[in-house]
């Protein structure tokens, strides 16, 4: 008998913060405001399960909303790389 793999939506897991791909126009504005090049942001691999789930491609910028016990909600950005 063939075994079925169990699937679940990783984005619904309680430990995974909200991720979203930033539109190109907004990404350009964010990069300009931060005064960095996209590749200077922390990296997120395109093969990361969450990157795959949200459809992030190399060159995209991903916004992540994290909950912090000391700072409340924190927004961080990641640059998607292909390796």
Curated annotation (Swiss-Prot):
It is an enzyme of class 2 (transferase). GO terms for cellular component: cytoplasm; DNA-directed RNA polymerase complex. One of its GO terms (biological process) is transcription by RNA polymerase II. It comes from the Archaea. GO terms for molecular function: DNA binding; DNA-directed RNA polymerase activity. SUPFAM superfamilies: RPB5-like RNA polymerase subunit. Belongs to the archaeal Rpo5/eukaryotic RPB5 RNA polymerase subunit family. DNA-dependent RNA polymerase (RNAP) catalyzes the transcription of DNA into RNA using the four ribonucleoside triphosphates as substrates. HAMAP family: RNApol_Rpo5_RPB5. This is DNA-directed RNA polymerase subunit Rpo5. It comes from Hyperthermus butylicus (strain DSM 5456 / JCM 9403 / PLM1-5). The gene is rpo5.
